[in-house]
Amino acid sequence: MKDINVFGTIGNCWYDEDSVSAADFAKQLKEADGEDVCVHINSGGGNVFDANTMAETLRAYKGRTTASIEGLAASAASYFALTADEVVIGPSALFMVHNPYTYASGEAKDMRKAADLLDKLRGTISDQYVKKTGMDKDEVEALMDEETWFTAEEAVERGFADRMSDAEPVAACVSPECLKGFRNAPDGLDAAAGDARRTIRSEDDTEPSPGAGEGGAGAAPRTVCVNGAFLKLGGGIER
């Protein structure tokens, strides 16, 4: 069996040396060459579009796939995990579902575009949870609205995981950047984030693009950030 680790932020993130991009994941899966695969997960989520791509790549894989949640599967990592043939969760692991979130700037029309994008993403994500658990869509989206955290036993009871493993307990850890988007994070995650190896630069530290005048030639496109992915509102994607 081929082992693949997703032990950091999903997406190619400068603030997390353990981050895993969709390209990284696809390369490792290709190297497995049809062999059974176990994806070991300890991730607070990240870039929703990388997670979607990773999920589709895993779903299309020809060999048998297992997702082993060993510390944390939160946000984008939670619905990515559900695309495996079997989802196994460690006895001390946590599972979390919530709504996608964004940082946006611009005019009123830009805010409406950002909100519309979030609504669409929320719908596609909730569909993944419904498919796995068999719960009603309204029930799933109510759980997402509340940012709901599940113990391993609760995750199995609600249908997010198929069974608990008998592995040794593993501490859940999440990057401080991912932690910013959590409203109801357990206390232990705060402590884990405090031990991060890097200081996270605030969004305000980014420098403007050269020649970016107010609405003039060379002006930077308006962007929104969805779970770590910066998108041009015209449809492009940038980090």
Model-derived regions, located:
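N-terminal organellar transit peptides
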Residues: 1-76, 83-239
